[in-house]
Structures are given as C-alpha cells and as structure tokens.
Amino acid sequence: MALSRQTTSSWDLRALFTLTHHLNKVDPGIRFKFVEHPRQDRPLREQVQRLFKEGDHIVIGSPKSNQFSEEVVCHAYNVAPYSPDQLYAFEFAFRWGSRQAVSSSFGSPAENGDVGIVSVATGELVARRTLVTQGQGEDCALIIVERVFRPVARRAHGRNDENIIIVILGYSGIGTVAGAHVAISKEFARALYPERTGKPLMKVVSATYARPPGPSSDDNREVTEARLLEN
C-alpha cells in the first residue's frame, strides 16, 4: 500500500485500517507491505513501472496530497501526469477549489465555487463536496481499478495470471475513508471489477457525513453513507 510521507493524515490511516482489517478477515495469512512516497521523489517513475509489473497494490490519497497517485493513475491511462490538457482521456475528474488546486491530468479549478467530481464529457458535477462546521456534509472519491496481466515467468507455481491495482482518491480525507468502505463492500464488488486486463476502470463514490456540534478544532466527522454511482 502506498501513502504520502509528508501529508498522510488520520483520515488516510483510517482508510488504511479499514482496508487491512477487511483483507485480514478475507485471508488471515495475507501479508502487507506499506510504502511511503515523499514529494519529488526522484525514482518515482521507476517505482510506478515496478508497481505495474508485480504484486497487488492499493494507493491511497488524492493528487492534492499524494504525488504518487497522479503518477499511477496517469500510467494506467497512458497519459502524461500533471498535464491538464490530458483531461479528456478520463471519464471523470476532480473540480477543486482555487486554494486547493494542483497541476493534474484529471483535475482542474472550479470556476463557480461548486467543487467535487465532474463528468468530463458534460462538465456537470456528479458528486459534490460541501464542508460544514456541524450537521450534514458531502464528500466524494474516485476509485480506479486495473487488472494487469502477469506473464507466466512471473507467476507463482503457474498460477495468479494477473495483478490488481486499486487507487482510492478522496476529494478530502473523509472522502478517502468513504472510498475505502465502498471498495470492501460486497454490494459494489462486481461493479469495481474491470471486464478485461489492461483497461483501467474509473468509478465515482458519493458520500455524506455527519459532524456533531463540538469545539471547532475537533474534526469529529463520521461517514453516514457511501455509495458507488452508476456511470
């Protein structure tokens, strides 16, 4: 599993715990390796290429906070990272507030204040992010899944003919947690499985959260609903 060293938050850790707890229940013998990726890591491209060659991987964190996410997703879609002119290679993209915007091939600044995830084809918002100090708010995430063909020479005992790459990108931290809940849900398992190897699948998660009254410094939000939208 890949995380950003500088910007790993408590939300990323909650998403990590959600995923590892589920996988341990599915297979108690499963082994995990956690990898941090600092910003401007020089061998980043080489690490991305290795990731697609061996093993099953989960990458956590949006391009706002995890540079590795941008690199992995763009490698899957065979486009240059950090290139806004590549937006139309994707079905969906982030629409960020101006203070949060970063250079990304699948994200751009909002022009009217509505932030979240948009359909690239229509430009319409399909999942919204609203921040509240108390009450009900909204967040969202992108989940990208790719099945990667594994050549016979790299298979264990002639089995395991493919690797799975999963990238969970929340608009904010609670969106990443919501994405983790959707990723482990039996309800959405079929919809998150690509039809064939070599073709990445991108899906949108829409989530609501509750924030009870409390000290303004306490981030006491809890996910109340997380669902996978139909394309």
Where are these regions (language model features)?
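Solvent-exposed alpha-helical segments and adjacent loops
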Residues: 1-231
